[in-house]
């Protein structure tokens, strides 16, 4: 068979590429393109050579030329999308993957790549239907099932995620990704011991990956095994020194273990070695703000290069720091830069509204928050700050949003199996004390002068905790039934009472004398509650010492927001309220401790099992 000159050159180029001789491969391919500029295979090979040389810009140029000549090549669109993804152009990558699927809806590679990309970009809600559609063509695609499970985890559909991971493991029992995903779903379902078993099995099978070590740290932390969690996060950073969440979790764990002098050293070691990724720097600066280290914050800030601080995420942090110092013009400049992206995180919009409130601009804050709520109607932070803005404006909608009858008090009484309330609380305190393994409060939390348990405290299969859980479940059902039966408008269009629900978080707090909670909200829930196990005695000098109060935010505003409601901490009493209500506690001085169990509830996403 007689080959043309371009064909011979391409064959020589391909042989050189296989041998790793990139310079020769590139030269022969360029000669082929000079001889035949519209030869599709030459552009395809040139792209492969560029990818091997880690030159994605050149690869994209040749892939676009190849696709102009062969627009129905799904593999070409997949390669182009992958190249865009590697070079940090997610929108272009998404368009390429979608074009590939237009050519062939059943192409598994393009669909998996698109689902993975959307999940990575924080668009799991959009990734889920794309994955589900693909499973209609390939129901045994373990990779797609795993990706679907990972996207479902982000939406807290833990039961559905577990079902998908189990299905993936039926088709590919050795899939480490599906096994680890299964562990994360179990953790989300408050089955920490089962999650730990799954992760340990992967460890014993020889898997060494930073994500495994990081997830082990998270589960061990949930279980209150903080020293072991610390070691796991250290191992995660040894395997991947660039993974920001491991730095944050390690710092948080060391702080809880009482190391408030050196808890941020891992960040500083990373910076000294030249690791200056924006998420890492933001986490460090945010931690300094959280613990009130303003001088250290300014020193650290001045040590980072200007081009790094120009990143939107860091502009958000600088805006918050300026607002806290009362430097509002500077804060607004930083906010504008942080919010310059087409769709910035809603949390940053909330920070900007917070600055507007601090600066005495509730009208601007309300307008911003109402726009943001159109993107996420159930966002608890947005509702909380909107309630403040409406209150300051005298807007009657504030009274509806903060209606007093939304705070519900129930005295639960003695659960079965216990003779008296005192006997129940004595047993409950003993079980809870075993879980208070931290030496001080988490630095990013709102309690001061006490400790907080890790993970979901209501998961514990212990007699008193189990009895309390049954009481709380009945109380929540009764409360939701009451809310559903009420006529009239809802407090807000976002305020809908769920059908199936779950505990999205539950923890115990043990405050010491002079301890208290700053004013805060619970953004992870729909309704929240606190059950009083132990309360300080009445103080003649301060009749409301240790009381729960609702109303003002944790902001020093030009106009004071009054306290709207107060509740006494009576052992055996449960107080339920919307999670977006600003609430906190007054400090107390008498007695030994103030012990509570608090929780949030959220809608429960049931599995489809299709």
Question: Where on the chain are the PLM-derived regions?
Answer:
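Catalytic core of non-heme Fe(II) oxygenases with the double-stranded beta-helix
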Residues: 463-473, 477-576, 581-610
């Amino acid at each position: 068979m007689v080959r043309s000159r371009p064909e011979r050159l391409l064959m020589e180029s391909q042989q050189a590429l296989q041998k790793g001789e990139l310079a020769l491969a590139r030269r022969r391919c360029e000669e082929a393109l000079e001889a035949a500029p519209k030869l599709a295979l030459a552009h395809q090979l040139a792209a492969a050579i560029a990818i091997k040389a880690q030159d994605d810009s050149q690869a994209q140029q040749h892939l676009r030329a190849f696709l102009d000549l062969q627009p129905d090549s799904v593999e070409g669109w997949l390669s182009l999308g992958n190249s865009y993804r590697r070079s940090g152009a997610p929108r272009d990558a998404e368009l390429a993957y979608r074009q590939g699927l237009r050519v062939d809806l059943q192409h598994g590679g393009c669909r998996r790549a698109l689902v993975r990309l959307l999940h990575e970009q924080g668009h799991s809600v959009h990734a889920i239907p794309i994955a589900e559609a693909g499973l209609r063509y390939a129901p045994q695609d373990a990779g797609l099932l795993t990706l679907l499970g990972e996207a479902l985890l982000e939406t807290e559909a833990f039961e559905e995620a577990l079902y998908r991971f189990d299905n993936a493991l039926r088709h590919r029992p050795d899939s480490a990704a599906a096994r680890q995903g299964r562990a994360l779903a179990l953790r989300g379902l408050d089955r920490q011991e089962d999650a730990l078993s799954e992760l340990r099995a992967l460890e014993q099978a020889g898997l060494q990956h930073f994500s495994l070590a990081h997830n082990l740290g998270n589960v061990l932390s949930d279980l209150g095994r903080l020293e072991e969690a610390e070691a796991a996060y250290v191992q995660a950073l040894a395997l991947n020194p660039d993974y920001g969440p491991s730095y944050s979790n390690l710092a948080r764990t060391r702080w809880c273990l009482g190391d408030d002098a050196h808890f941020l050293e891992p960040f500083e070691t990373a910076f000294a070695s030249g690791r200056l990724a924006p998420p890492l720097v933001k986490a460090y600066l945010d931690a300094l703000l959280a613990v009130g280290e303003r001088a250290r914050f300014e020193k650290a800030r001045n040590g980072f290069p200007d081009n790094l601080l120009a990143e939107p995420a860091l502009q958000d942090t600088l805006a918050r720091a300026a607002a806290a110092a009362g430097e509002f013009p500077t804060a607004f400049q930083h906010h504008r830069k942080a919010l310059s992206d087409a769709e910035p995180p809603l949390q940053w919009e909330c920070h900007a509204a917070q600055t507007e409130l601090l600066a005495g601009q509730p009208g601007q804050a309300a307008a911003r928050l109402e726009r943001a709520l159109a993107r996420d109607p159930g966002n608890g932070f947005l509702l909380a700050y909107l309630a403040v803005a409406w209150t300051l404006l005298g807007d009657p909608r504030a009274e509806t949003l903060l209606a007093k009858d939304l705070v519900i008090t129930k005295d639960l009484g003695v659960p079965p199996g216990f003779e008296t309330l005192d006997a129940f609380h004595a047993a409950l305190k003993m079980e809870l004390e075993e879980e208070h393994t931290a030496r001080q409060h988490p630095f990013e939390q709102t309690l001061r002068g006490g400790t907080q348990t890790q993970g979901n405290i209501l998961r514990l299969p212990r007699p008193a905790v189990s009895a309390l859980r049954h009481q709380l479940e009945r109380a929540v059902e009764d409360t939701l039934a009451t809310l559903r039966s009420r006529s009239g408008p809802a407090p807000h269009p976002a305020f809908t009472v769920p059908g199936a629900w779950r505990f999205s978080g539950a923890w115990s707090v043990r405050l010491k004398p002079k301890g208290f909670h700053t004013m805060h909200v619970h953004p992870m829930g729909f309704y929240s509650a606190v059950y009083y196990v132990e309360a300080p005695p009445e103080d003649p000098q301060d009749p409301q010492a240790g009381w729960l109060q609702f109303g003002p935010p944790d902001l020093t505003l030009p106009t004071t927001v009054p306290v709207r409601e107060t509740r006494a901490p009576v052992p055996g009493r449960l107080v339920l309220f919307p999670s977006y209500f600003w609430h906190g506690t007054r400090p107390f001085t008498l007695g030994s401790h103030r012990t509570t169990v608090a929780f949030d509830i959220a809608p429960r996403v049931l599995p489809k099992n299709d």
